[in-house]
Structures are given as C-alpha cells and as structure tokens.
Amino acid sequence: MIERGKFRSLTLINWNGFFARTFDLDELVTTLSGGNGAGKSTTMAAFVTALIPDLTLLHFRNTTEAGATSGSRDKGLHGKLKAGVCYSMLDTINSHHQRVVVGVRLQQVAGRDRKVDIKPFAIQGLPMSVQPTQLVTETLNERQARVLPLNELKDKLEAMEGVQFKQFNSITDYHSLMFDLGIIARRLRSASDRSKFYRLIEASLYGGISSAITRSLRDYLLPENSGVRKAFQDMEAALRENRMTLEAIRVTQSDRDLFKHLISEATNYVAADYMRHANERRVHLDKALEFRRELHTSRKQLAAEQYKHVDMARELAEHNGAEGDLEADYQAASDHLNLVQTALRQQEKIERYEADLDELQIRLEEQNEVVAEAIERQEENEARAEAAELEVDELKSQLADYQQALDVQQTRAIQYNQAIAALNRAKELCHLPDLTADSAAEWLETFQAKELEATEKMLSLEQKMSMAQTAHSQFEQAYQLVVAINGPLARNEAWDVARELLREGVDQRHLAEQVQPLRMRLSELEQRLREQQEAERLLADFCKRQGKNFDIDELEALHQELEARIASLSDSVSNAREERMALRQEQEQLQSRIQSLMQRAPVWLAAQNSLNQLSEQCGEEFTSSQDVTEFLQQLLEREREAIVERDEVGARKNAVDEEIERLSQPGGSEDQRLNALAERFGGVLLSEIYDDVSLEDAPYFSALYGPSRHAIVVPDLSQVTEHLEGLTDCPEDLYLIEGDPQSFDDSVFSVDELEKAVVVKIADRQWRYSRFPEVPLFGRAARESRIESLHAEREVLSERFATLSFDVQKTQRLHQAFSRFIGSHLAVAFESDPEAEIRQLNSRRVELERALSNHENDNQQQRIQFEQAKEGVTALNRILPRLNLLADDSLADRVDEIRERLDEAQEAARFVQQFGNQLAKLEPIVSVLQSDPEQFEQLKEDYAYSQQMQRDARQQAFALTEVVQRRAHFSYSDSAEMLSGNSDLNEKLRERLEQAEAERTRAREALRGHAAQLNQYNQVLASLKSSYDTKKELLNDLQRELQDIGVRADSGAEERARIRRDELHAQLSNNRSRRNQLEKALTFCEAEMDNLTRKLRKLERDYFEMREQVVTAKAGWCAVMRMVKDNGVERRLHRRELAYLSADDLRSMSDKALGALRLAVADNEHLRDVLRMSEDPKRPERKIQFFVAVYQHLRERIRQDIIRTDDPVEAIEQMEIELSRLTEELTSREQKLAISSRSVANIIRKTIQREQNRIRMLNQGLQNVSFGQVNSVRLNVNVRETHAMLLDVLSEQHEQHQDLFNSNRLTFSEALAKLYQRLNPQIDMGQRTPQTIGEELLDYRNYLEMEVEVNRGSDGWLRAESGALSTGEAIGTGMSILVMVVQSWEDESRRLRGKDISPCRLLFLDEAARLDARSIATLFELCERLQMQLIIAAPENISPEKGTTYKLVRKVFQNTEHVHVVGLRGFAPQLPETLPGSDEAPSQAS
C-alpha cells in the first residue's frame, strides 16, 4: 500500500514571540494549547502563509488591526512579524520518502500601508540530520543568533552537495512543485483554484459549516465535463459553418446577374481609369519632354541674353564707375574752383588785414615810445614827490623835536633819550652796531659818499636804459618775424635762420613763377593720357568680347577679316530659312498621316482583341477569314457530340443516386413498405437480423437466402394469415419466415456450399443454386461498402457531368463569339497593323523635330556670330584712329613728372604767398640779429635795484646826519651855546620846511597831471594793442583758413580751375549720354531676360511639376503595374482600343460605371468601402485594389478548382453546376452532423448518473462518522425539477419542439435555451443571452442540487444548517464535508499525477474548546481512519489523549516578548514525557 505523505514540522523564524521555533507535527493531531494571546493563531497563520503565500487571499480576521483602512494590504499578517527577515517553513516527507522543505521569506515593507513582501522557495535533497533552524540562522554566541537573508541562504545551500534550492517568482510555479511532489492534493493552476483551496483551509480553520463551501459544493466536488461541452461547441461550429456555406451558395446563386453586372461595370470602371492614366502618363511624358526641350532652348536664349546683359552691364558699370569718377572729378573741379575763388577772396582779405596790421604796428610802436617816456617821467615825478615827502617829514620831525626840546628845555633827560633813539635808528639803518656819537661823523661821510655813488650809478643806468630800449625794439621786431616764418627758436640762432630764410625765399619766388606754364603743360598731357586710357579700355573691351588678345599691329587686318565674315554669315542665314521651311512642310504631312491612322487603330484593335480571345478559347491560330468560317463548322459538330455524352452521364448519375437512396434505408430495406408490414405483423426484417454480418460473410448469406433476403421474420405465421387478406400495398413477392427474432439462425435451410456458390434445398424436389454476388448488399457492412463505391462513382459522374456541361456551354459561347466576330470585325481583322505604321511615323517625326532643333541652334549660332562680328567692326572703328596714342608708352611718366614739378611750384607759391611780406620786412633789419643787445629786462631790474640802493643810502645818510645833529645832546656842558644855536636852527628849519612843502606841492601837482596824461597814453596804447591783437587773430584765422583750403590763389588759378571744370563737365555729359543709351539697351535686355526668366520659371515649374507628376505617377504606376501583374489582371485592364479615346470620354465612361457600381455594391459593406476608397483620383492603385477585391469577392464564392477561364461569366455559369452539387453535399453533411435532442438528453443523464454514483461512493466514507447527537453525515445530490422536465421533453416530446431545433437561424445551444424558456416562463433569465443560457444547460452540473444532510437524534435526516446544530456538531459536520472535498480532489488528481503518490492531508481547527471530549475523540478517529493530520488550537482546558500537545505561554522579559513552548506526547497514566527540544528557546538575537 502506498504510504501517505506527511508534514513533519513547522518552523517560525523571527515571528512575533518566536525567534527560531520548530514545531514537530504529529502524524494525526497536533494541539496548540494556551491562553489568549499565547501565539496559537500566529502559529497557524505561519502554516497557512507557507501553504498559500497569496497576499490577495490571506486574511487573519481575528487579529486584524483595529482601524485598518480598506486600502491596507496587511490583512493581519504585518502585525505578526518582527522587523527584519522572517521565515515560515514546512518540512514534509512525501510518498517516495523524499524530504522537501517548502516555505516563504517574509519581510515588512516600510510605509503606511503596512505591506509585507513574500518570496516562496523550496529545498530538496536536504539530509534528515539538518534541522530547518540551522539553515536560516547563524549562531553568533551562546545567547545570540542572526537570521540569514534569502541570498545568503541560497549560497549556503548551493555549497551543500546534493541539495537543490529553488526560488519562485510566481505562486503558480510554487504550487505546481508542491502538487508534483505530493504536498497538496490539487493542482492550483489559477487564482480561482487558489481561492478555493484557501476557502477550504479557512473553513477548516474557523470551524463550522462554511456557507462559502456549501454554496459552491458543485465546484468543489463535481468535475467539469469539458469534453462534452467542446463536442457540442465543435458540432455547433460545424453546423454554423455548413449553414453559412449553404446560405452563401444561395446568395451566390441569386446574385449571378449581379456578378455579371459587377464584373462588366468594374472592368469598365477600372479599365477606363487604367487606360486614362496610361494615356495621361504618355501625354505627360510627351509634355515633360516638350517642356524640357523648350526649357533647354529658353535656357540657351537666357544664357545668350545674360551674356549680352553681362557685357552691357559690365560696360554700364564701367560707365557708372567712370561717371562716378567723372562726377567726383567734376565735383572736385567745381569745389576746386570754388576753393580758388574763396582763396582769392581770402587772399584779398589777408592783404587788407596785413596793411591794416602794418599801419597799426607803426602806430603801436610810436605809442609805446610815448608811453615809455611818460612812464619815465612819471617815475621821476614819483621819486621827486617821494623825496619831497621825506624831506617834509624829516623837517617836520626835526622841527617838532626842536619845539619839544624848547618846551622841555629843562628836562635834559628827554633830549638825551631822543639822541639815543636817533643813534639807535642810525645803527639799525646803517647796520652799524658799534656806531657811537663820536664816530657818527666819520660814518656820515662814508655814507654820503655811498649815496653820491648810488646816485651816479642810477643816472648812468637810466641813460643806458634809454639807449637799450631803442635797440631792443628793433631786435624784437626782427626776431618775431623769424619766429613767425620758421617757428620757435633760440635767440642766438635767429641770425643764421634769418639768412637761410632769405635765401629760401629767393628760390621759392623763382619756383612760384613756373606754376602757370607747368599747369598748362600738365593739362595738355592729362588730356592725352585720358584719351590713351579710353583707347586702352576700348581695346581691352574688344579683346574681352573676342576672347583673345590682339596686338596693335593686328587690328587693321582683323578689321578686314570681320567685314568679310559679316558678308559670309549674311548669305548663310538666308539659305537656312529655305531649309527650315522644307522640314516644317514634311513634319505637317507626317502629322496628318498619323491622325488618320489613329482614327483607324481602335477599330482594328477591337477586332484583334476579339480575334485573340477566339484564338485563346479554341487554341487555334487564324490567318484569314476562311480559317474562321471553317473552324465554326467544326465547332457546331463538336457541340452536338458533347450534348449527347452529357445526357448519357446525367442518366447514369441519376441511377446511382436512386441506388444510394435505396441502400441508405434503415434496416437494409430497399422498400419502405416492408418496414410498415414488419411493424404491422409484429415481426422483424430478415435484413435487420443480419444487419451486423461482416463484409466477408455478406456474399454467403446473400446467396443463402436469395430472393427471400427481404423477408419478414414473424413469431407465428398463423397470426399473420388474417393480415394477408386484402393486402395490396406490398411488393410483388412477399416472403414470411417463422422464427424468434431474438434467437434466429439459418438452420431452416439445407445448404451445400460450393465454390463461390451455394445450393439451397428448399424441398425434396426443389433446389436453388445461387452464386455469390459480386456486389453483396446483405448486411450493413456490405451496404455501406456498396454505398461507398457508389459515392465514389457518383463523384466521378458528377465531375464528368459538370465537365461536359461546362464544355457544352463553352462551345455554345464560343459559337456565339464567332458569330459576333464575323458580323462585326471580320472585314478589318486581317488588315495591316496601323500602330506599327504609327510607330514608324512617330520615329520619323522625332527625327524631323531633332533636325529642326539642330537647325535652329545652328541658325542661332550664326546670328550670334553675325552680331558679334558687327560689334567687333564697330569697336575697331573707334579704336583705329587712336593707335598713335596706344603706342606712346612714356605719356604717363611725363604726366607724373610734370605733376611732381607742379606740386613743387605750387608749394613754393603757397610759401611765398604766406611769408612774402614777413621776408620783405625782415630783409632791411636782418642785420640787428647779428648781436643780441643787453637784456632789456635785466637792465630794468638793475635800474630799479640802483634806485632802491640810492634810496637806502639816502635814508642811511639822513639817519647819520640826525645822529650827528643830535651829538650835542650827549653833552650838557654848554647849554647857553646850545640855546642860541637852537634858535638859529629853528629859523633855518622853518625856512627849509616851507621850501620843502612848496616843493612837495609842486611835485604832487606835477605827479597828478603826469599820471592823468600817462593814463591817457595807456588807454590809447591798450586800444591800439586790442585792435592789433584782434586784427592779428583775424589774420591768423584767415591764413589758417587759407592753409585749410589748400590752394594757391594766383592770378591764373581761377581760369585754370574753370577750364578744368568745363572739360570734366563735357566728359560727364558724354558719359551720361552713353550710360543712358546702355541703360535703355540694358532695360530692354532685362525686360527680355525677365520675360525669358518668367517663361523659364514657368517652364521649369511646369516641367518640374510635370516631371514630379511623371515621377509620382511612375511610382504609383509601378505600384499599379506590380499590383496588376501580381494579380494577373493586366490583360483585362490594358484595353488598347481605349488608348485612342480622349480623357473626357474615358472619364465619362468610368463615371457611368462608378454610378452603376455604387448601386451594385450598396449591400456589400466591404466592396462599398473599397469602392469609396477607390474614388480618390490621386490613388489609382486603389481602383486596381477594388478590381482585385471584386475578383476576390467572386473567388470567395466560386471554388478555385472550377475557375477554368478568365471570363467571369463563364466562371459563374460553371459555378452554377458545382454549387448544386455542393448544396446536396452540404445538406447531407448537415444531416450527419446534426445531433438529436434525444441524444443530448441521454448524454446528460448518463453523466448525471455517473457523478451521482461517485458522490454515493464518497458518502460511504462518512457513514461511520458520528458525534454528539449526529449519527451520520451524507451529501445529497438531486436533479432540479425544471431541468428534469427539460430532459424529459428532449427525450420523449422533442417532436413537439422541432421548430426550434430545425431552425437554421438558431444554434443547438440557442434552441435549447429557447426550449428552457418555453417550459419555464416563470423564471427570469435576466440580461443573459440565449447562447449563454444554452451553454449552461449543456453543463450537467447546472442540473444538480447538492446539500449536506445529517442524521440527528430522533429527527432523522435533516439539512445541515448552523442554526439546527450545536457548535461541536457544526464543526464536525463541516470537517466531514471538507474531508470529502479533499478525497474528491485526490481522486480527480490521480489522473493528472502518478498513482504511486499519495498527497499530504492536513486540516486546521481553531478554538477547538467548542467541542466536547466525544467530538474530539471522533476527530481523532476520523484522522486515523483517513490518514489525515489535524492541527487544533484550544485553550488550556483541552487535554487530548492522543497526538502531540504544545503548551504555549507568552512572557515578557526586559520589555521583550517571547513565547515559552513545552511539548507533550499523549496523556497516559504514567508521567508525561517531555519531548526533546521543547525547552524554552531564546527569542531575541542581537
């Protein structure tokens, strides 16, 4: 017996309260005991998470955080985990004794949604000695361990030999491995399967009768019969396709005329547009070539005009440049004339101002002398007045002192003090600190001598100063003149510079006298130089136009050569005109012949098309009209023979059909009356009894019974006698055989078997010899073999009949085509090809056009050469008179030389004009510069110094005189002499004082008078100086302006400037006249160029548009041609006769066909859309697509193997024959495919019975289950009343509803849904379609109702409902149903998985305290009998007697929670045995 797989242990790593805990699972029941919050639900949650790691399903509702939002994805799992990496692992042993560890790595994801990240994995090949906790933890020390991340776990396992580690990216792959290894009972292919599995676990976990399970028990227990549904769907699809084909055939048959009309109009519509585009393409090509030729011609003309324009523009630019230069020269000459006139006026002003300045200079010098004399006299008067003042002051002082002395004569001390004061003042003034009264007299003489010396020196300096002032005035005048001419210089260099300036002045005056002769000479040479430059320009222009450089000596010979060329070209132009006329005449004749041939070509092409069609249809070549008439006679004879053979084949085909219909009768009866007689007599046809005879025995039994093989076997012949009376509706020979139809044998005859024959001894005197038939018909196998061979023969006959019919119709159509050809085209069909002649004439026309073009080019070149020769002669006529100037090479050098000399002379003239007066004034007084007189300023300073010295000496002498005079005061011995002496002195002093005051008054009067006169002199001098300075400044400004003007104003300058201006004005007028002529010619040339440019631009635009149109049309045309060739419709569309119609005619033809097509395809959406798209004139390929779509539309309705001609009408006629055969075949096929409603009912009933039996077998496993008052549990399966009525109607009363099942508009599913609605009108079907309802009715599961029943106490069998059962009874009932579901899954999965493996079987039960001891014991018995593992979570009051119990206690140690776990095995009377490894495990790790 196969051992069932088991779960060995559950391992929790880093869960809330469990750091590294492994729970060893009992083979039957594992109990988790503990109080509230001990960790029981957490342990079960870890198991469920490892079993179904789907976050969309997991929901531990009893521990979901309060207040969690609906958007939270926690579902109670996030709070059971601790931070970091967490694991939940299941250690299993399957039926093959393979250890498999499956589990998940969990980790909290930071965020408000409290998400959890889950990664499933599996480990295979792990040794039994390795514990799960050792894999995922790493011991750091005695009290600390670390949880390994998943990547480190992978690396650790890969390092272990023989161990396989698999990490899964999808839950489906994870469950697939668990199913293959026998860990779970069902393959969970989808989220729906996982949801069912989770709902089962959830129902087990929370106990009771789960409404989610009981409501969907059909989905859990009844397998889907997808094969039956697919068979029905395939049948319906085949019927639908068959009916659609039949409908299409009927539509095709009804649309035959429409197809003919569609083909005709589509051909006209597309072919007309196709040929119009072909014609337009040819026309566009011709136009593009014509535009290109005109474009090349216009470009050549434009190039010639541009060359001409460039030459004239160059000449005009030269004239414009020359005009600019001339205008500039003329303006410069005018400006020069104005400047000369201005300079002359300025020169006159300068001369007037210079005369005024000379006069003012003289007056200023005279006034300076007057002022100087007045200043000297003023100084003398000031000195006398000052001396008089001093003298008066001294006398007054002396007189005052003396009076004071007289007043204080008695006071000697005052006098003595005055004497001492005088002595001190004398010491100070005389700078004699050792002066005494005794030595004062001596020093007085000394200082008086010094005063006399100072006075003499002052007088001497005054005389020198008067003499030096005159010399200084002449030197300064000469020095200022030199400075004015030469610029600043040292005074000692004035003499040398003045002599050099005088010599230079002589030379400059000599050069200035040569200005006028040089100017006249230069004007003459410049005129010749301009003429020479003009001749050189003309020669260069001539050489440029000729494209060759010529020497001066060659010009006369070239002139004669050009005149000869002009005469020759004139003759050539006249001859070319006659040749051009002849070519144009021939061209017009060719064009007329081509037009006549183009009118005849369409008729010939139509005849040729008809003739080619006839040749293709009959496979003959016709060279004359006689061949056509002879072949028509042969065609009539062939038509008669084909009609006779077709009628014979048709008769044989009808005979075969009748025989097939006869042999196809049920029971092998060839006569329907025999079936009715057999039913009437209560017998059975002999053929029905032997219906199962093999094909090998069929000849024997056919010969054995002979004519009686159609007999009726009846139980008693005597009972048939009464029915034979008056029997008329029967075969001529009716055989009746008595016997039991259930045990009939062939012992009624005496038979001798021969070679391929039998001898039947009917009676002693009657034998029958029957040979074995070659084609036996006795028995179903023989009939089917014969029918098969008849069908094969019928196929051959049908094909032959179709072929003959097609040949007859083809021959008839061919006869009609020949008749139409003879009547319409025979007269012109065998004439010569006009298109070939048109091609030859077009080739000749192209040659003529090319000859004309070449002739025009040659003629144009000759005209150009003629014009060039004329221009060359004109240019030479202007150059030849100036050859002598061209030969003068030194003219420019002479001009430059004279211009340099003139510049020097003009510079000298400007120098003389500017400094001539200064030089004239300098020349008489230049000698005073030889020696520089004493410095006048120094002399003035010395004079002033001597005056000061004389004044100081006078004061010193006066001071000493006073001391000497007061010397008596130093002695008091002789007072009487002093008084008498003082009286005389007083008188003298008074006299002197009066004289001094009188002198002072006179000096003051003289000083005031002379000061007034000096003031007048100074005012006059200031006025003269101001006038002089003003005129000098104006003169300097005029001279600067004259220098700025830059011209030398002499007597002939104005005349020369005026002559130069007039010459330039004449040249400018001539240049403007030529420029105007060139501008007019250039304007005309530009107008011609503009016209040519516009024409060229228009030609370019037309050409490029046409070229682009040609290129675009070429691309589109290539696509059209490719599409035409790929689809093989070129022959139909390329109708050459349409090429000679105009575009309007073709467009009209296409538009008329388009209107007809719109009506023809109005009901066909595809063709209507394609036709609408084809109306785009820019997309001609879409018309081809429409034509191809029309053909494709026909091909979809005509079998490809019967389209034997390109003529659509012939194909449709042939299709008529084939469609009739197809209709018959499809009708018979539909009858074979159609399944009867009785068969459907039987299939569904058989399926329901099979599943009821399976549920009954499952119920047997629950018969012994009892708990509480529940004696037994079962699952009741019943057929719904409405569906049972449907099955009855389908099997018994289906004939009443054949309107539904025989309708071609309804599928079988829809008919079934309509029948269901007809039988149950009270049921609301909602928004579901009949097809959906019908598909549901084809699923047998919808016919069944399932409910759980319990046998409870005295109530008997009741429906299991939570309200009618106690809590424990409900849990037990639910557990029983879950076990049934698991059992059903295992049975179903044995077909998918090997039968040598038995999966693990484990359920949960939380809060088991609701069960009593008997119920718990019942669960233990159930687990033991079903080999099922059970995990129970219960409070501490549960003490099972069997299994393994874990006691969980949650403790808090140092703010850290951990669960204390103690495991016990069983509860025997002896002391409980502590399980190994059940000590408290540390729950914290660093």
Curated annotation (Swiss-Prot):
Plays a central role in chromosome condensation, segregation and cell cycle progression. Functions as a homodimer, which is essential for chromosome partition. Involved in negative DNA supercoiling in vivo, and by this means organize and compact chromosomes. May achieve or facilitate chromosome segregation by condensation DNA from both sides of a centrally located replisome during cell division. One of its GO terms (molecular function) is DNA binding. It holds the Pfam family MukB. Signal peptide: none annotated. One of its GO terms (biological process) is cell division. The keyword Cell cycle applies. The hinge domain, which separates the large intramolecular coiled coil regions, allows the homodimerization, forming a V-shaped homodimer. Its main location: cytoplasm. This is Chromosome partition protein MukB. One of its GO terms (cellular component) is nucleoid. Homodimerization via its hinge domain. Binds to DNA via its C-terminal region. Interacts, and probably forms a ternary complex, with MukE and MukF via its C-terminal region. The complex formation is stimulated by calcium or magnesium. Interacts with tubulin-related protein FtsZ. Gene3D superfamilies: 1.10.287.1490, 1.20.58.850, 3.40.1140.10, Immunoglobulin FC, subunit C, MukB, hinge domain. Transmembrane segments: none annotated. Disulfide bonds: none annotated. HAMAP family: MukB (MF_01800). Keywords: ATP-binding, Cell cycle, Cell division, Chromosome partition, Coiled coil, Cytoplasm, DNA condensation, DNA-binding, Nucleotide-binding. Belongs to the SMC family. MukB subfamily. The keyword ATP-binding applies. ATP binds at residues 34-41. It is found in: Cytoplasm, Nucleoid.
